[in-house]
């Protein structure tokens, strides 16, 4: 399964601020939210169609009063939208205090856009920016997968990695997640793996985005692999802990076994690390050990 990591809202904001004078008025903590697309939504009924990670644009034609606008904002946040752009002027002249207070509390970004801005141009410009970013991320993901599954054919992936300033000796942080097939109950056997993997990958992507870390997350067979360009240290530990916590949240739905790579992982040995961490995940399942470190690999081979 391929779920391409999207653009970070903060990057969109930097572009829209200079090109369209878009201003942030609340919810700055959410600027690291990922954005898949830009949608114009004017009615509450359409919120239920959102998939999450959308930047919503509205003129407020249907939410003119404070109570309706606050309800609209809450529904967007609960639907997983990344932020809201209000085209102020004709229908909404200012963002109500109650909306600002709520957005600050939950970290949901609210922006204002001058009425003079043509929304068609605004939406198209930002969607093009998102598409370009996703193409770049997609090429990086493809190259890293080739470094794992076709590692001898360096000419197919090293030029792309060089474009991203990644070389054979670049240190890589790698985490492998294993989701065994089947289960003991009928519910486990009937489990929808596709939706589960989709949601788990998106949550992992958001963890890296919040940490300002360049990363790739992909699924192959019963494994989800996380690869990030991050130097050894406390930040690796924090990310590993968050992924472990995430797996605990999902473990009620499906059992997850995690193997965390050591500090010697580089692009040149990525394929070996993938093999070793996959084995360690399966060993963890046998020992009912949900989280394993690569340093345990030697012990696992004694069993």
Where do the PLM segments sit?
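Cyclic nucleotide signaling catalytic output domains
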Residues: 259-264, 272-287
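Flexible glycine-/small-residue-rich
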Residues: 177-179
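Alpha-helical/coil-rich non-catalytic "connector" segments in signaling and regulatory proteins
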Residues: 1-172, 185-221, 225-227, 231-260, ...
């Amino acid at each position: 399964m391929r779920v391409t990591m999207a653009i970070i809202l903060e990057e969109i904001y930097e572009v829209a601020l200079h090109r369209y004078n878009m201003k942030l008025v609340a919810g700055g903590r959410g600027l690291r939210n990922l954005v898949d697309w830009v949608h114009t939504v004017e009615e509450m009924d359409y919120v239920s169609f959102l998939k999450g990670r959308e930047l919503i644009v509205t003129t407020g034609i249907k939410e003119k009063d404070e109570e309706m606008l606050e309800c609209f904002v809450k529904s967007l946040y609960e639907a997983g939208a990344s932020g809201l752009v209000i085209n102020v002027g004709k229908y909404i002249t200012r963002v109500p205090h109650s909306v600002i207070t709520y957005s600050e509390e939950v970290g949901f970004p609210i922006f204002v856009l001058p009425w003079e801005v043509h929304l068609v141009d605004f939406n198209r410009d930002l969607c093009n920016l998102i598409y370009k970013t996703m193409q770049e991320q997609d090429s990086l993901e493809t190259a890293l997968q080739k470094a794992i599954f076709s590692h001898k054919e360096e000419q197919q992936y090293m030029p792309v990695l060089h474009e991203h300033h990644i070389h054979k000796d670049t240190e890589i942080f790698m985490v492998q997640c294993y989701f065994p097939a089947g289960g003991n109950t009928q519910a486990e056997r009937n489990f929808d793996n596709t939706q589960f993997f989709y949601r788990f990958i998106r949550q992992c992507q958001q963890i890296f985005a919040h940490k300002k870390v360049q990363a790739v997350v992909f699924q192959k067979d019963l494994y989800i692999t996380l690869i990030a360009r991050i130097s050894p240290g406390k930040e690796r530990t924090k990310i590993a802990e968050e992924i472990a916590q995430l797996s605990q949240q999902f473990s009620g739905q499906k059992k997850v076994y995690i193997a965390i790579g050591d500090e010697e992982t580089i692009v040149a040995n990525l394929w070996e690390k993938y093999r070793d961490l996959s084995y360690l995940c399966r060993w963890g399942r046998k020992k009912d050990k949900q989280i394993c470190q690569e340093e345990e690999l030697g012990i696992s081979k004694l069993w």
